[in-house]
């Protein structure tokens, strides 16, 4: 009996990941656990938001859309859409202390939004770890005196290969001389010229097939690196946020050390200033183009990780009164500042490369895998001690990818554990994590085949594109207009001690949904069939891409119909009201925080536990404070 009455039961210790010597009294929620401290949450969220796209997509978008002029619409979209949506998702998860499924006790009919988030996180988690595994492969390949993509004398090279370092008198540790005019002219005019880095990527690493349907063989080196990547992710999450919260002290901060080292090295190179000017020189006429604003809005939306479910999940492990408003501003600004900073790192090196080749910067600028695994590695071969710079660059990519991957996996695991919710699965959370990791590894195997890059880009372009916009829009509408904006504002005031600022109230109700709708319309208008270099995807593969996108969105109406059919009511309208109003257990997870309108009307029994208590037994009545200070109840959310 004494053990049962102690402050912490053994099952709680095992579930929340605390080691025996770690004082769990710091955790408010003994059932789920909390972050060790607030720095862990901030670093984890920074690692989640700051990913590969900050390095390989934003600098190219900025250069293509007017240079420094692109910063204006970019930061406008950050202020009016990015930060408000970030704050909404953090406050949503923190208030309920639930993952992306459990939070929809707020309006059970919209629980399909949570399932849609899970589907999106599954897709992203599968292909994102394949990108990390390729970075691992390049990292291991850089542990040589001479980078394997430096010269054209390898078995996989073709007669079209041309390298500025093919001269045998040039060693890897010497400063490359200026290019002769005839070589520069040849590089400009020879259409067949391929670089050693491009052939290494296409003919050796990928052994790229000629069609998306021709899978060929599984590339065993990539498969091994994929296994390494998933093992690392699993080990870092073996105790949930208790273990990942310690890892992020390194994974979320060291990339900035590497960026700074690469920046200092880059700006000291000849031609770096030219590259930076290409990146920053404003073309103010571009601001009048709708495409620039659309790209800015899309980049803000996708780079912050909105509607993936990760923000809700990470915030659910916060203590109830944590200032998530402050955190959302800090993390969002850090994410965008990192994107701008990475642009200096990328374009300083590309400017140096363009200067060496005697070509325009636009000829070497690229984005996506082409930048990370072809253009930038080729530029690194021009530097003295190039393997060192290559090791640093790919180690940075690995850490950036892992920071996002941690949250993607934890999103799925938390959703499963919260949904099942019994004591057995709480004690076996580590096995759930292992099961999800193994499933992710198996599903990623086709992406390591010779046609894998085609499928990876297909998933990247469709699985997490306009579906995220739809999910985010429905989330905004359901919280602000179905649950009720006044209800939600009062929830935040109860949690933080102050209501959301007026600016955020306006953004949540009007501005942000309008911007999200604009992004959706822009995505439809600007849609172009996916291509990879000169390869045109067959129409049937594009249809598969659309099916992947719809698979997450379709969860919303299907679950709404399911919930509507299983809800009691005398009339259709009555059933609709019952299906959309909050569940009885909606609200703060801990009894000590269920005050005022969330206070239980009956004394909870020991079997019910102390974490989650029911609301009023008849209906989830939420009192609203009128203008005269009196209290009134709002039953309907419609």
Curated annotation (Swiss-Prot):
InterPro entries: Na/ntran_symport, Na/ntran_symport_glycine_GLY1, SNS_sf. It is a multi-pass membrane protein. It catalyses: glycine(out) + chloride(out) + 2 Na(+)(out) = glycine(in) + chloride(in) + 2 Na(+)(in). The chain crosses the membrane at residues 41-61, 69-88, 112-132, 220-238, 247-264, 300-317, 329-350, 383-402, 431-449, 465-485, 506-525, 544-562. The lineage of its organism: Eukaryota, Metazoa, Chordata, Craniata, Vertebrata. It comes from Bos taurus. One of its GO terms (cellular component) is plasma membrane. Interacts with EXOC1; interaction increases the transporter capacity of SLC6A9 probably by promoting its insertion into the cell membrane. Interacts with EXOC3 and EXOC4. The modification Phosphoserine is found at residues 605, 630. Keywords: Amino-acid transport, Cell membrane, Glycoprotein, Membrane, Neurotransmitter transport, Phosphoprotein, Symport, Transmembrane, Transmembrane helix, Transport. It holds the Pfam family SNF. Belongs to the sodium:neurotransmitter symporter (SNF) (TC 2.A.22) family. SLC6A9 subfamily. Glycans are attached at residues 169, 172, 182, 188. This is Sodium- and chloride-dependent glycine transporter 1. Sodium- and chloride-dependent glycine transporter which is essential for regulating glycine concentrations at inhibitory glycinergic synapses. Residues 1-29, 597-638 are annotated as: Disordered.
